[in-house]
């Protein structure tokens, strides 16, 4: 089953609208990725509009963390998800998205990338 992102076809009163056109492929969406913390990296590259590509990250165990003081990027192992402003239930399920605070080997970091869209977890070290 796909997600349709076009007009609903209903009037505000509940009656049916006259259909102006058929459903088009560009009006389709997809389910949210919900990148999870796992033991290995699972990623898939999909075709998007205009022939472009998008990398979807399903599971990850490492993150590219930027250290502000040293001004260096380190690839470190993610231990757990600490806090998620998008949804508090994502913490229990270890789901990582943009803005999530993760616990890593070198300290806590905030995720700056969109793992479901970019295919990688980039983060910035918190003090």
UniProtKB/Swiss-Prot annotation:
Under PROSITE patterns, the record lists: RIBOSOMAL_S8E
Q: Name one Pfam family in it.
A: Ribosomal_S8e
- Region Disordered: what ranges? 1-25
- What InterPro entries is this protein classified in? Ribosomal_eS8, Ribosomal_eS8_CS, Ribosomal_protein_eS8_arc, Ribosomal_Se8/biogenesis_NSA2
Biological process GO terms, please?
A: translation
Cite the entry's keywords alphabetically. Ribonucleoprotein, Ribosomal protein
| Superkingdom in the source lineage | Archaea
GO cellular component terms, A-Z: ribonucleoprotein complex; ribosome
The entry lists its GO molecular-function terms as: structural constituent of ribosome
Which family is annotated?
Answer: Belongs to the eukaryotic ribosomal protein eS8 family.
Subunit record text? Part of the 30S ribosomal subunit.
Q: Which HAMAP family match?
A: Ribosomal_eS8
The identity of this protein, by name, is Small ribosomal subunit protein eS8
Species, as recorded: Thermoplasma volcanium (strain ATCC 51530 / DSM 4299 / JCM 9571 / NBRC 15438 / GSS1)
Biological classification of the source: Archaea, Methanobacteriati, Thermoplasmatota, Thermoplasmata, Thermoplasmatales
């Amino acid at each position: 089953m796909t997600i349709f992102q076009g007009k609903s076809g209903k009037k505000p009163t509940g009656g049916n609208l006259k259909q102006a056109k058929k459903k088009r492929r560009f009006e389709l969406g997809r389910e949210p990725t919900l990148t999870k913390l796992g033991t290995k990296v699972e990623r898939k590259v999909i075709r998007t509009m205009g022939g472009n590509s998008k990398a979807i990250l399903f599971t990850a165990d490492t993150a590219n963390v930027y250290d502000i003081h040293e001004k260096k990027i380190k690839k470190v192992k993610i231990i757990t998800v600490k806090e998620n402003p998008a949804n508090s239930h994502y913490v229990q399920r270890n789901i990582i998205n943009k803005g999530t605070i993760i616990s890593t080997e070198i300290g806590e970091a905030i995720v700056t990338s969109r793992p479901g869209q970019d295919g990688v977890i980039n983060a910035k070290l918190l003090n």
